[in-house]
Design a protein with these regions (language model features):
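Active-site helix of classical SDR
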Residues: 66, 102, 110
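Short-chain dehydrogenase/reductase
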Residues: 1-28, 39, 49
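Substrate-binding pocket helix/loop in short-chain dehydrogenase/reductase
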Residues: 42-43, 50-55, 148
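Short, small/polar-rich loop/turn modules that mediate ligand/substrate recognition or access, typified
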Residues: 118, 123, 177-179
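Alpha-helical segment proximal to the catalytic Tyr-Lys
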Residues: 71, 115-119
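C-terminal substrate-recognition "lid" of short-chain dehydrogenase/reductases
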Residues: 78, 156-184
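Residue(s) in the substrate-gating loop at a strand-loop-helix junction
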Residues: 86
Length: 189
């Protein structure tokens, strides 16, 4: 592949940190918003700080990076923004209310921003993975994971490689495809 990728460490939920990171990189033509954390538990037990941490990392970070990347894309009249959402952004999940809200916000951001940027030939889409075999899902017990897998018609969790492959496909998708929330969930939801 003829792709240049860079990685930086910063607090994605803090605009000043994201702005500092953007000052160190060339303006991106393709932006993949993939920052994500979860909180598992009852909303009534969740602290205000935890709520803000989840929303800042999952939703505000996508706003910050998009805000900083868009001027270059508009100037070039070309760009792709791919937001990583979740099936919980489509249907919500008990015990993961903040995560569901943040991913629902990602879906709304994707749809609205796609309409705003389409005249500039910038496509904005989201991928909504289901249960993917990542560290974030391994906070669940083996019993809970097995129970969820029983509900998935594909009878397994997805892999990070499958998500990456779909991201690559969306990057290379036709310019007429914008504002889409694409589920990758093994037929689960």
């Amino acid at each position: 592949f003829s792709v240049a990728c860079r990685s930086y460490v910063c607090d994605m939920g803090d605009f000043a940190s994201v702005e500092k990171m953007f000052a160190q990189i060339p303006a991106p033509d393709i932006l993949i918003n993939n920052a994500g954390i979860s909180y598992f538990g009852l909303l009534s037990d969740m602290s205000i700080a935890d709520w803000h941490t989840v929303l800042n990392t999952n939703l505000n970070a996508a706003f910050y990076t998009s805000k900083l990347a868009i001027p270059h894309m508009v100037h070039e009249k070309w760009g792709k923004i791919i937001n990583i959402s979740s099936v919980w952004g489509n249907v919500g999940a008990s015990m993961e209310v903040a995560y569901s809200v943040s991913k629902g916000g990602i879906n709304a951001l994707t749809k609205a921003l796609a309409k705003e940027l389409a005249p500039s030939n910038i496509q904005v889409n989201a991928i909504a993975p289901g249960m993917i075999d990542t560290a974030m899902n391994h906070v669940l017990s083996e019993e809970d994971i097995s129970s969820i897998i029983e509900e998935i018609p594909a009878d397994r969790m997805g892999t990070p490689e499958e998500v990456a492959h779909l991201v690559w496909q969306v990057v290379n998708s036709p310019s007429y495809m914008t504002g889409q929330i694409i589920s990758l969930d093994g037929g689960w939801i």
